[in-house]
């Protein structure tokens, strides 16, 4: 269930709220990636409650003030029961506040949109029973950020410069505290020499602190010939720092084949240099698994998207390939993505607002994996949908989707099983 609404208190003051309630009851393997050991079926119950409140002040006579404050809370409880296994449950709660102001001003050599603000949130995790894979602890995260997006007055050029300061602190009763902080600048530029062509480039830095699970988990990872491979805590994990560079181009053509059609194409290349990259190592000799830092890692890849819209059909096509390598040893890290092509076609059925859809996801075999890890075969997964958007009631929408229609058994490039055949119902009404 999802609901949201807003109210205009005055012309300058607005407020709103949203609520999302989710419940799921299922019977599933304790760990779907295991084929040995205690991996019987578990009764699993999941309940998630998300709530958000926001207030916005935007006076029409002052282009420098457009401030929005948001309070949010997310609470997730997962309880699992199984035969011959102690019940386990865990609760994850995230609460935070975000304040941002956007200012519009004209300062040579163009128009500026300034965005600046702050965010604070706390994540808390509490396990019970045998849920040692999810350690007790909390994380406090504080951010300050600033960005200036400038549109040149006399040239078709957009320039973005900004910076973000992040401060991270985690606590676990057994391991104590971990603190980290980082200033992450970024810059981007886009040029549109014609109405149909756009070229862009960017460079940005970021940091990622280790999660509680990466530092503290100590449960069974998997079984091999009846013997367990355990997670080993690593309290010496360092935060990950990286620099990403991206370059690409896009085109947009209107009236290509018919009067009302549009073709959009966009493609880009990205490369990331990471320091203290957080990866996972599986030691089969000692039967243990743990997270560790790769001193220097290289991640790179390609993204391409195409979108064709017309009165007769809509077609979206996307392609991605991502590689990851230890820059020192030249070994694959196995956290990339093999050649993956996604095709999404929607065709109107009649003139009453009904559309039929077909989505195909095609993935090549994953061969650039860690040394000793198995290669994953390629796969093709097809999904079908039927949606209804009545012309007379534009605020209503309903759809039914059959995901993985042929119940294909496959794993993605990281070895995670894909969901089986699933039927989803969706409806939306706005007033």
Language-model regions, residue ranges each:
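Flexible loop and strand-edge segments within Gram-negative outer membrane beta-barrel domains
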Residues: 12-64, 72-94, 130-132
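Short loop/turn motifs that connect adjacent beta-strands in outer-membrane beta-barrel proteins
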Residues: 11-12, 58-66, 104-113, 151-157, ...
């Amino acid at each position: 269930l999802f609901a949201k609404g807003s109210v205009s208190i005055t012309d300058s003051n607005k407020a709103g709220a949203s609520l999302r309630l989710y419940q799921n009851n299922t019977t599933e393997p304790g760990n779907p990636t295991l084929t040995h050991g205690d991996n019987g079926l578990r009764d699993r119950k999941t309940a998630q409650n998300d709530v958000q409140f926001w207030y916005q002040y935007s006076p029409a006579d002052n282009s420098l003030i457009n401030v929005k404050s948001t309070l949010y809370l997310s609470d997730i409880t997962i309880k699992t029961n199984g035969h011959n296994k102690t019940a386990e449950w865990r609760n994850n709660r995230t609460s935070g506040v975000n304040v941002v102001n956007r200012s519009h001003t004209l300062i040579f050599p163009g128009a500026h949109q300034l965005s600046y603000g702050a965010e604070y949130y706390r994540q808390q995790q509490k396990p019970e029973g045998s849920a040692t894979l999810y350690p007790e602890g909390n994380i406090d995260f504080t951010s300050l950020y600033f960005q200036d997006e400038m549109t040149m007055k006399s040239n078709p050029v957009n320039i973005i410069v900004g910076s973000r300061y992040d401060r991270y602190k985690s606590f676990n009763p057994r391991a104590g505290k971990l603190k980290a902080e980082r200033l992450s600048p970024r810059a981007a530029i886009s040029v549109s020499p014609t109405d149909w062509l756009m070229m862009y480039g960017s460079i940005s830095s970021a940091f990622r602190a280790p999660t509680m699970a990466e530092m503290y988990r100590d449960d069974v990872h998997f079984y091999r010939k009846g013997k367990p491979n355990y997670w080993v805590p690593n309290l010496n994990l360092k935060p990950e720092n990286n620099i990403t560079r991206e370059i690409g181009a896009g085109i947009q053509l209107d009236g290509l084949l018919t009067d009302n059609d549009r073709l959009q194409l966009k493609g880009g290349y990205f490369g990331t240099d990471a320091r203290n990259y957080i990866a996972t190592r599986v030691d089969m000799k000692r039967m243990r698994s743990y997270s560790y830092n790769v001193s220097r890692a290289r991640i790179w890849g390609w993204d391409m998207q195409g979108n064709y819209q017309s009165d007769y059909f809509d077609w979206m096509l996307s392609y991605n390939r991502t590689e990851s390598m230890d820059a020192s040893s030249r070994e694959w890290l196995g956290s990339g993505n093999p050649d993956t092509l996604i095709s999404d076609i929607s065709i109107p059925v009649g003139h009453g607002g009904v559309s039929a859809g077909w989505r195909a996801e095609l993935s090549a075999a994953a061969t650039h994996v860690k040394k000793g890890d198995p290669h994953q075969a390629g796969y093709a997964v097809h999904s079908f949908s039927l949606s209804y958007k009545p012309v007379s009631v534009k605020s209503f929408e309903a759809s039914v989707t059959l995901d993985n229609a042929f119940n294909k058994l496959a794993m993605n490039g990281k070895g995670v099983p894909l969901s089986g055949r699933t039927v989803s119902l969706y409806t939306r009404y706005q007033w």
